[in-house]
Amino acid sequence: MQQKVLSSLEFHKVKEQITAHAASSLGREKLLQLKPLTDLSDIQKQLDEVEEASAVMRLRGHAPFGGLTDIRSALRRAEIGSVLTPAEFTELSGLLYAVKQMKHFISQMTEDGVGIPLIQAHAEELITLGDLEREINSCIDDHGEVLDHASPALRGIRTQLRTLESRVRDRLESMLRSSSASKMLSDTIVTIRNDRFVIPVKQEYRSSYGGIVHDTSSSGATLFIEPQAIVDMNNSLQQAKVKEKQEIERILRMLTEHTAEHTQEIAQDVEVLQTLDFIFAKARYAKAMKATKPLMNGDGFIRLKKARHPLLPQDQVVANDIELGGDYSTIVITGPNTGGKTVTLKTLGLLTIMAQAGLHIPADEGSEAAVFDNVFADIGDEQSIEQSLSTFSSHMVNIVNILKDVSENSLVLFDELGAGTDPQEGAALAMSILDEVHRTNARVLATTHYPELKAYGYNRQGVMNASVEFDIETLSPTYKLLIGVPGRSNAFEISRRLGLPEHIIGQAKSEMTAEHNEVDLMIASLEKSKKRADEELSETESIRKEAEKLHKDLQQQIIELNAQKDKMMEEAEQKAAEKLEAAANEAEQIIRELRSIKQEHRSFKEHELIDAKKRLGDAMPAFEKSKQPERKTEKKRELKPGDEVKVLTFGQKGALLEKTGEKEWNVQIGILKMKVKEKDLEFLKSAPEPKKEKAITAVKGKDYHVSLELDLRGERYENALSRVEKYLDDAVLAGHPRVSIIHGKGTGALRKGVQDLLKNHRSVKSSRFGEAGEGGSGVTIVELK
């Protein structure tokens, strides 16, 4: 696909928008290389990946990308034997941790039954290198400093360094405390010059201390001298520092060699994490744009529902339905300039390119997009100064090139076709060019302000006229696309509303041909009919959606009711079975005891017979009651709505709602409503008398104890955001108008995550960092709705 077309449709600006959602420079790099694909299966795979990432975000909020940095140059240096720096090892350790975290995160999602096969496949390519990560962490801290315990030798050297340094300082400080020091020294401090300890001596007392001058003040009045008394001590200190440097070099070289053994695995991890960042950035962009996954086809059919231009402010952009490639393969949008025709044309082109680049598009669910081998566009004033071409010539050169390469698998966009020359000749050329492209069966969207093209779509099969609606009341375009209705200039109406005298307008109308006036009247009538039809269709669609939702809700209620009923029946049967088993066990025990007495040839004693009879009686009635519940109501009591009853089948209490038949009632049991036969009901008590007092709904309010602050310090990022979500809900229930969230200052990652969550939370009115007395930027104050 030509770069010129991508630029004219401003695809590069879309990519810039998406890069803002990447978690790393690696992700941004891959996003900037994004380009449209032409293989349907590849496109579908990328769209599905974004869909899976969106599902992960809905369920978990985000994926863990902390620690993902670009260490590819360090890996290349390790391969050729260059020793890596402590800072580079810190970044490498962070990356290895990120690999481990991501692998565990995706694994946990799949174990929980979340279907993300494509993302799972990427995660399975990650290679964890726990031994290398632990080795690096045992030698280098998070700030890139080599730890004392990186080796026994380094620990010993640093112990010696601290001892020597302490001796040097003690000796110098004793010099500073001497009685003559205040006279001879510029300041009573120990400082460092050329990595050696020195004291500031006044110029005139240089000879009093001897030793080595390492530096001079800018005025020359002060000399920074290493006194002779500590030269040998400083030399010993320097020798120890050389040993420290050599040991650190040895440790870093060892770590570099171990890293070099795994550069291929690490490079693969970098590539996989880059791809995952790329996918999740596209998903975050889709969420921000309220974009959906388009249904892709290779048949050249486009149906965009409520399509919106992604580069226009989302609170101002007008959504349009655009269909192409079904009953008609060419659309010609006519009407005056500045009417929004070009925006519609660019929306179609840009959304097609976005879909082919594996991006979700800003359009409603169910939108369909086609895969084209090429998208051609002739948009805007592209005259070439270098070639000394006029606007018309420049456009014509572009059109000639399009005609050479266009095919049935092309999408062609013409903006103001035929403009820049004599109107009659331009209109004739426009129709001829459209005919030529239409014959190739390419998909075409063209805009023009030539009135001659208004009738173009009426006498050509597969061509449809369209226009952009103009509001006469406000004298401005609504940017609403009207398929099947050609455009008109509205010049007379606009002039009348702006105050042009009526006799001038009347004379102008008389200059127009009768045929032209009839066409304008026909178009006006079509516009009204189209608007009325759209309103009726919108109302019908709204009713249909409401009916579908109601039907779905009812089906769900039936499923839940049946599930509850089955559960209650199962519990009742289980209880009955348990009682039966207990009775049978008791009976068997009694029989065994009686048989034992008989086998011993003993006569039955009276108390033994009485006891056995009693135990049988205790066991059997319980079973019989459970098997044969009394299924009758009070004979002398007439049931009425509101009565509390017992449903004998389930042994559950309920309230009567209404009588549905001669011997049948609707009963409310908890959250369930069901029909029950009257014989299965037992009256418990009458309906309470209605109270005249106003009903009070009990909700959790200010007595519900929730702290006014939430401390997140020390929490992991994911756990912290989850706690914030729950805390805000609890705080609202508790009636708190304002709460504080303590996240600390740190690296700022948690603070940013909290701020981003608060921006979109339904219960948050506003948020700000704390004042000086409230904790500053380490605390966020939240005003609740």
From Swiss-Prot:
EC number of the protein: 3.1.-.-, 3.6.4.-
Function: Endonuclease that is involved in the suppression of homologous recombination and thus may have a key role in the control of bacterial genetic diversity.
Ranges where the Smr domain occurs: 710-785
Keywords annotated in UniProt: ATP-binding, DNA-binding, Endonuclease, Hydrolase, Nuclease, Nucleotide-binding, RNA-binding, rRNA-binding
GO-annotated biological processes: mismatch repair; negative regulation of DNA recombination; rescue of stalled ribosome
Gene3D superfamilies: 3.30.1370.110, P-loop containing nucleotide triphosphate hydrolases
Name of the protein: Endonuclease MutS2
Pfam families tied to this protein: MSSS, MutS_V, Smr
SMART domains hit by this protein: MUTSac, MUTSd, SMR
InterPro entries in alphabetical order: DNA_mismatch_repair_MutS_C, DNA_mismatch_repair_MutS_core, DNA_mismatch_repair_MutS_sf, MSSS, MutS, MutS2, P-loop_NTPase, Smr_dom
Subunit annotation: Homodimer. Binds to stalled ribosomes, contacting rRNA.
Binding site for ATP: 335-342
Molecular-function GO term, any one: rRNA binding
Primary enzyme class: hydrolase
Protein encoded by which gene: mutS2
Keyword Transport carried by entry: no
Top-level taxon in the UniProt lineage: Bacteria
Species in which this protein is naturally found: Bacillus velezensis (strain DSM 23117 / BGSC 10A6 / LMG 26770 / FZB42)
Family: Belongs to the DNA mismatch repair MutS family. MutS2 subfamily.
